[in-house]
Amino acid sequence: MNSQQCVIIAIAGASASGKSLIAKTIFDELRRDLGTDQIGVINEDAYYRDQSHLSMDERVLTNYDHPKALDHQLLCTHLQLLKSGEAVDIPCYSYTEHTRTAETLTMTPKKVIILEGILLLTDPKLRALMDASVFMDTPLDICFLRRLTRDVAERGRTMESVISQYKKTVRPMFLQFIEPSKQYADIIVPRGGKNRIATDILKTRIQHLLAK
């Protein structure tokens, strides 16, 4: 494998469908073979557009489940730079402030990059950069309960705001954009991030791509 190339794996699916869990499992298991500095994870959420020019009231009204809320062009540019052997500065996004922070996270070139995010498979330019893709096909009611627990506990949200957002944008955008993007996935994973067989299949695919 050329030292300036890298394998890009995308893990998509509904919010709280198990994307982070399967990404972490693969990261932890592959870094033992590749080394910690040779595998990295990029969360699509980091590429939510900067909204510092908007008031907090305006930021809250943003539809974060629509593809336009994300700067996929910047993500594509960063992936192309990483594939060509250059480091990039990944934005940092604040869920409480609903905008990017002043900080960035520098990522150096890797042999394996795992992308995780709800809308990754909706963008044809992003899909063209992927070596393999996964869709987490977890039932939507389970995703909602997980999201409710997570957002209240970890992201400073109220139960009422999470429920309201789910009804107004999360579920409609899942049906309009996220679920249809499943057709572009190479692997469809049922039963969430603890699906051991799916994890092993994906690891084997990554190892095969690295061996080329």
From Swiss-Prot:
Coiled coil: none annotated. Gene3D superfamilies: P-loop containing nucleotide triphosphate hydrolases. Transmembrane segments: none annotated. Its EC number is 2.7.1.48. Pfam families: PRK. GO terms for molecular function: ATP binding; cytidine kinase activity; uridine kinase activity. ATP binds at residues 13-20. One of its GO terms (biological process) is UMP salvage. Its main location: cytoplasm. Disulfide bonds: none annotated. It is an enzyme of class 2 (transferase). It catalyses: uridine + ATP = UMP + ADP + H(+); cytidine + ATP = CMP + ADP + H(+). InterPro entries: P-loop_NTPase, PRK/URK, Uridine_kinase, Uridine_kinase-like. It is found in: Cytoplasm. Pathway: Pyrimidine metabolism; CTP biosynthesis via salvage pathway; CTP from cytidine: step 1/3; Pyrimidine metabolism; UMP biosynthesis via salvage pathway; UMP from uridine: step 1/1. Belongs to the uridine kinase family. This is Uridine kinase. It comes from Shewanella baltica (strain OS155 / ATCC BAA-1091).
